[in-house]
Amino acid sequence: MEILRASEDYLESMLMMKLKHGYIRSIDVAEHLGVTKPSVTYATRRLKESGHITMDKDGLITLTETGMAVAAKMLDRHKTLTAFLIAQVGGQAVLG
């Protein structure tokens, strides 16, 4: 199933919130991404429909196995890119 780039960003942010706080709340995702709460509400509805997350009666979000796989892939990709860019800048500083 094809997932939108914006949805990948939301899932990655949700994983980061889970790792940082131990739980995922919509308000934390909104603050982390710099978006409005209604934007997060819209995204979570889409992610629930696609089976990437569940939400309990208190509004706490849980990544499903599928959602966790996408989120972990995105987080790993960003960590790899960050490490690469830091290595490139570090090499240029030495050469410069």
Where are these regions (language model features)?
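N-terminal helix-turn-helix DNA-binding core of bacterial DNA-binding proteins
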Residues: 2-35
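Canonical helix-turn-helix DNA-binding module
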Residues: 26-57, 65
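Generic detection of well-ordered alpha-helical segments
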Residues: 8, 72, 76-83
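Amphipathic alpha-helical dimerization/coiled-coil segments
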Residues: 79-96
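Basic, amphipathic "hinge/linker" alpha-helix immediately C-terminal to the N-terminal HTH DNA-binding motif
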Residues: 59-77
